[in-house]
Amino acid sequence: MQTEWNFDCANIEQNVTLKPGRYKFECWGARGGALGTPFESGFYYGYGGYCSGEITLKKETTLYLYVGIDGRKGYNFNGAGYGNGASGGGATDIRLIGGTWDNEQGLLSRIIVAGGGGGTYDKQHGGDGGGLKGTLGTSSTGAAAHGGTQFEGGRGRDKDGSCDGFFGKGATPENPSSQSGGGGGWFGGAYPASGFGNGSGGGSGYVLTKDSYKPPGYTPTSEYYFDNVVMTTGGNTTVVGNYSDGRAKITLLQSLPFLTVSSYNSTQATFKADHTDPTLLTKIEYFIDDILKETITTDLTLE
């Protein structure tokens, strides 16, 4: 029986259908891009964030996964602000509604997100992705590019909002050939200011809990609340072949029995039993008024 599912960046929607059970979900955001030779020439990547949590699914559930891409590859998939080779890193998220990565209903159905790092240009730092919030991208001009938070996109210097990140989207600069993009995330990171390059902010992460912020139009209900949450800004430091793409992982922690009742009245009920691990379903006992009436040991998964 499969107990682990891994997802790498694919530039498209991916999906998985899980049986009832207790699971751990993990997401790593992608690193932001940089124009030039990082570190040796003074460029500093914004690293992707890491978020995880544990959830109990009480019914069979189909989930949609969007895995961010390293900003050096020049894509804007899953919220990365476009900036040529200095694009922001894409966010990695798991959501309840599929479709194109940027469709509004899909963005409003995300239950866990790891932010992407901000892109960087001209010997500055890109901000790291969240985690609880993305960090600041630095600028030689003092034009700060803030990271996304739980409640709003990162803000740049221009007061008209043209440099700011948005819900699910990092900022794309007016001149992508010489400026960096903000990291994707729950809320995306900003880029510094019109006409300036330098480092952009990282996107924020998110994990749905009882106390987490739910924006207007948000659709997931309390059945998708997580516990044992971990949110680490800049938590994706894995590099493979000079790139640090996002990734996602789902691990089955505990298999569970479950029962689907299709009809019932005062004298009879029609039901179907199953188990996350069918080999562990060995018998069905039914009771009336706490009195055992029958034990079924054959054809256990028939209706």
Give the positions of each predicted feature:
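Short proline/glycine-enriched turn/loop motifs at strand-loop junctions of beta-rich domains
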Residues: 20-21, 30, 276-281
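Secretome/extracellular-domain signature
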Residues: 45-146
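Proline-enriched interdomain boundary motifs that mark the N-terminal boundary
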Residues: 255-262
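A short beta-strand segment in extracellular, disulfide-stabilized domains
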Residues: 266-275
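Solvent-exposed segments in extracellular or luminal domains encompassing
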Residues: 298-303
